[in-house]
Curated annotation (Swiss-Prot):
It comes from Aliivibrio fischeri (strain ATCC 700601 / ES114) (Vibrio fischeri). The gene is queG. The keyword Translocase does not apply. This is Epoxyqueuosine reductase. [4Fe-4S] cluster 2 binds at C201, C217, C244, C247. GO terms for molecular function: 4 iron, 4 sulfur cluster binding; epoxyqueuosine reductase activity; metal ion binding.
Length: 371
């Protein structure tokens, strides 16, 4: 059976759109140019406690070792920006918890993996014999360099992939295949001299163009770090209890980003009320029930309370907050450290964070639809 691979590649992109992906590109598996930078980043310890990154090392840059026989990677993008994102209104109210917008709906891993699997099955029907494997970011693979190579966008200074139409509000997934599909052309970097993301990072986690010290990043601190959050970062976290979107919010390319068509990525009803005290009152069973099917669930109840306690410490003085914090003392040793800090903070006069106020003004001016 003779296969027209160019025609097949065109069809793959059509099928992917039918499965809910907004854009698809194809590349080869050579990521050798990224291996040295990856090793340097790991040696510097910028990955923090994410030991799995160091364990897999340069294998992350070798897709053909993850799935032997792989010669092409189909990289796919799925937009997640929810309607009525309410960025500015949320950040302006210190008594409301801020949750990164990618996590407001259902966990994307399973959904995207399932759609990639369906894409693989569709391709298999056409070529009769196909070796393939879907990956979403939980797997040890350098998905951003692959997506960049496949023409899905360019890497911003915040290390996220950027597309002219979608900004950076999207998930990535990969389908590794063993057929010689024609590859796509990378796009030109459009960031220019802009450094908005670097100057707006609350904790100065963006060290230089594309280099992130995860140990300083609020997303890492609230999600990947299960231990004690260093005191130097707590007040800078504000009301961000799960992730951080600041570097995306100031990016000019995100001003016209499209709203997701995937209803599963819309805000879940259990997060309709993000009042800090209300969320802090959830016991473990309530947390597990309300976060079923959510990416937030995997951090666990104690880490959820830890993050909330910091936000409560950063909120305006309130006897109700102090009482709620005191009621949780004794539940967990590490949690107590953060609660005691928060109680102490509540007794101080909280001054406005100038960088955060600037961020809110930028959102209201540049992202009025999503403010």
């Amino acid at each position: 059976m003779k296969i027209n691979y160019q025609e097949l590649a065109n069809n793959i992109k059509l099928w992917a759109k039918e499965l809910g992906f907004q854009k698809v590109g194809i590349c080869d598996v050579d990521l050798s140019q990224h291996e040295a930078a990856l090793e340097q980043w790991l040696e510097a310890g910028y990955h923090g406690s994410m030991d799995w990154m160091a364990r897999h090392g340069v294998m992350r840059a070798r897709p053909d070792e993850l799935h032997p026989g792989t010669i092409r990677v189909i990289s796919a993008r799925m937009d997640y920006l929810p309607p009525k994102a309410g960025f500015a209104s949320n950040l302006k109210d210190p008594n409301q918890a801020y949750i990164s917008r990618y996590a407001l709906g259902r966990d994307y891993h399973k959904l995207i993996r399932n759609q990639l699997k369906k894409l693989g099955q569709k391709i298999e029907e056409e070529v009769e014999q196909l070796g393939y494997r879907p990956f979403v970011d939980s797997a040890p693979i350098l998905e951003r360099p692959l997506a960049e190579k496949a023409g899905l966008g360019w890497t911003g200074k915040h290390s996220l992939l950027l597309d002219k139409n979608a900004g950076s509000w999207f998930f990535l997934g990969e389908l590794l295949v063993d057929i010689p599909l024609p590859v796509d052309t990378p796009v030109e970097n459009q960031c220019g001299k802009c450094t908005a993301c670097i100057s707006s990072c609350p904790t100065n986690a963006i060290l230089e163009n594309g280099v992130i010290d995860a140990r300083r990043c609020i997303s890492y601190l609230t999600i990947e770090n299960s231990g004690i959050i260093p005191e130097e970062f707590r007040s800078l976290m504000g009301n961000r209890i799960y992730g951080c979107d600041d570097c995306q919010l100031v990016c000019p390319w995100n001003r016209e980003a499209e709203i997701t068509q995937q209803a599963d990525f819309h805000r879940r009803s259990s997060l309709g009320n993000s009042d800090l005290i209300s969320l802090f009152s959830w016991d473990e069973s309530t947390f597990l029930k309300n976060m079923e099917g959510s990416a937030i669930r995997r951090i666990g109840h104690i880490q959820w309370l830890r993050n909330l306690s910091i936000a409560m410490g950063n909120a305006p003085h309130s006897e109700a907050i102090i009482s709620a914090l005191q009621d949780r003392l004794g539940l967990d040793e590490n949690l107590d450290i953060h609660i005691q800090w928060a109680i102490k903070q509540q007794s101080l006069v909280i001054t406005s964070n100038r960088k955060e106020q600037r961020l809110i003004r930028i959102i209201e001016k540049g992202l009025p639809r999503d403010a």
